[in-house]
Every structure is written in C-alpha cells, then in structure tokens.
Amino acid sequence: MPPLGPVKRNDLIYYLRRLDFEGPYSGGSHQFMMKGNTTIRIPNPHRGDIGKDFLIRILRQAGVNKKDWEKL
C-alpha cells in the first residue's frame, strides 16, 4: 500500500496500471496514460522522486482519491 508521499516515476506508472490506466504512450514532450476519456501526463524521468504535492495534482487529474491510492 503506497503512502501519499514521494514516489518514483516507475512506481507511479505501476500503480496507475493497477487502477486500470493504459500506457504510458509517447506524445509530445511527455508520455501519457489513459483510462476511458481521462488522459494524464506522466512526468519525464529525473533523478529525484515525484513530490507529494505533484503526486496529489496527478491523482486529482486522474480522479483517484487518497483512500483508493492507499488501498493499492
């Protein structure tokens, strides 16, 4: 169960796939993942983890609440 905090990019992709998102697909300057009509951009790989505030914004765009995220 992932805590709502910093997460590695690959872990974010793994958990989004567990939430039935497909991808990541190449597109423009960022990859993206899709679930139905919902499309979210995935941050480019960098040295550090994705911070808590940025993770919250990504999850909000994906329509994932804190409880669903922490149940994974």
Identify the function of each model-found stretch.
Residues 1-27, 32-72:
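Basic nucleic-acid-binding interfaces
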